[in-house]
Amino acid sequence: MSHSLRVIFAGTPEFAAAALAAIHSAGFQVPLVLTQPDRPAGRGMKLQASPVKRYAQEHGLAVAQPPSLRRVGKYPAEAAAAIDQLRATPHDVMVVAAYGLILPQEVLDIPLLGCINIHASLLPRWRGAAPIHRAIEAGDAETGITLMQMDVGLDTGAMISEARTAITADDTTATLHDRLAQDGAKLIVEALIELERTGKLAATPQPAEGVTYAEKIGKHEAALDWRRPAAVLARQVRAFDPFPGGVATLEDGTSIKLWAAVARDTQANGAPGTITDVSPEGVVVACGEGALRLTQLQKPGGKRLPVREFLAGSTLAVGQRFQLPETK
């Protein structure tokens, strides 16, 4: 089935690529795709195209990669050229998903039917850059996707529709990301079909209550603070998979990445950070409240391993201690 609605798409990572694929596969015209410039990645630090760019190129869609869309700052000429290109490209609506660039009012005003954003939280909770990570880290029982009509604020636009999903005890950012990407793809196609049919989408202003912000995840957050409750640390490990991973550093300076852990309510005998039990079922570490059983670990230069395999090639012993990060 083909559609007459013309959609400019702006996005960068896998989350956005799922939406672009759904829009294109549903038969909507996509005259232009915006994505961030290629970035160095991998061990060789070679320039790599974004997942959105790869999809666009594989399907013959035009791609633009401006470093900015703002006429002020480091790239005014590039921004001006990109804005001219947007104006010159016949389209009806713009869809934005994890694009990574700020869209000024000048850009938001170009599409006749506005700009729709696919955001990975139940707004107004977790506005900002890392909503999936922060929802898991906070222990939220559910999260979801919100479609909103974009304005110049940070995820402050009126809400068009939402899809909810429970956060399970086993969910990591990786698993929840994939589920939400599919939910977002389905939701945006439904919205575009409705927009094509009626020429407008009903939208509800976000409530003033319940606003929280999902700050970007930094590598400095990876170190586990064993003075915290075990339940909090278990959520942190899940939230930081696949990036940046939980990190525990032994007193000799050896850093171990932690990829799976289970909180135990029983208080371990030992100061926070002390290994109190080592077995094929897990490495138990004392915490401020309860204890954390580590079940998937990775040594420097190695790969993720179940604890049984990890212990076969690494010596961890009862009484060893992990460092406590400095508190601010």
UniProtKB/Swiss-Prot annotation:
Attaches a formyl group to the free amino group of methionyl-tRNA(fMet). The formyl group appears to play a dual role in the initiator identity of N-formylmethionyl-tRNA by promoting its recognition by IF2 and preventing the misappropriation of this tRNA by the elongation apparatus. It comes from the Bacteria. It catalyses: L-methionyl-tRNA(fMet) + (6R)-10-formyltetrahydrofolate = N-formyl-L-methionyl-tRNA(fMet) + (6S)-5,6,7,8-tetrahydrofolate + H(+). Belongs to the Fmt family. PROSITE patterns: GART. Keywords: Protein biosynthesis, Transferase. The keyword Signal does not apply. GO terms for molecular function: methionyl-tRNA formyltransferase activity. It is an enzyme of class 2 (transferase). GO terms for cellular component: cytosol. Pfam families: Formyl_trans_C, Formyl_trans_N. (6S)-5,6,7,8-tetrahydrofolate binds at residues 121-124. Its EC number is 2.1.2.9. Gene3D superfamilies: Formyl transferase, C-terminal domain, Formyl transferase, N-terminal domain. InterPro entries: Fmt, Formyl_trans_C, Formyl_trans_C_sf, Formyl_transf_N, Formyl_transf_N_sf, Formyl_transferase-like_C_sf, GART_AS, Met-tRNA-FMT_C. This is Methionyl-tRNA formyltransferase. The lineage of its organism: Bacteria, Pseudomonadati, Pseudomonadota, Betaproteobacteria, Burkholderiales.
